[in-house]
Design a protein with these regions (language model features):
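Flexible low-complexity loop/turn motifs enriched in small/helix-breaking residues
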Residues: 1-150, 171-174
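Short beta-strand edge/turn micro-motifs at domain boundaries
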Residues: 155-173
Length: 174
């Protein structure tokens, strides 16, 4: 969780703040702003009354699995991969006033709506890869619209006070 906190602080939160978004929802590896931010009709968002339908989980439980493939042709592949490779992890609570952790659920129609062409303010990051010498790497991306965004590897060091971002390595920018 400390790795995710450091990555969110260094990569995603500044971009959402720069664009004037309010709270942020982390959903199945995808970051989506809560509705109520400025100009909500221009960005995909999750309304507070939708939170129950998305089955918010306790802050200490998070299901990690492969996600992100879209389109009906890929649905079966994604579900098959997730069924073979999913695993449950119990994580300490990520206490943030502006971040909510939601249990990844099957959101084919929601994902389609949230990642519609021209949408802005979507981001996400991979599960961290750890080294034995106290480092971690995370793949992070931020999409600010059609043909707008970037992706990078985030290298973190484990110090006495926790994980800190050491550097980011840009992979692509649009």
């Amino acid at each position: 969780v400390q790795v995710y906190s450091a990555v969110v602080d260094a990569t995603l939160r500044p971009k959402f703040r720069q664009r004037g978004y309010g709270s942020v929802v982390l959903l199945a590896g995808q970051t989506v702003p809560l509705c109520g931010a400025p100009k909500p009709q221009e960005i995909p968002c999750i309304r507070p009354d939708e939170m129950g339908r998305l089955r918010a989980t306790s802050a200490s439980s998070l299901q990690l699995f492969a996600d992100g493939l879209v389109g009906t042709a890929r649905t079966a592949i994604t579900e098959s991969f997730a069924a073979r490779n999913s695993r449950s992890l119990t994580l300490p609570s990520l206490v943030r006033s502006d971040v909510l952790l939601l249990e990844p659920v099957r959101l084919a129609e929601e994902s389609q709506r949230l990642s519609s062409p021209g949408a802005s303010g979507l981001g996400g990051f991979s599960a961290p890869g750890y080294s034995r010498d106290g480092q971690a790497v995370v793949y992070a991306f931020y999409l600010c619209g059609n043909m707008c965004g970037y992706a990078c590897f985030v290298l973190l060091d484990r110090g006495e006070s926790g994980w800190r971002v050491q550097s980011t390595h840009l992979l692509w920018v649009s």
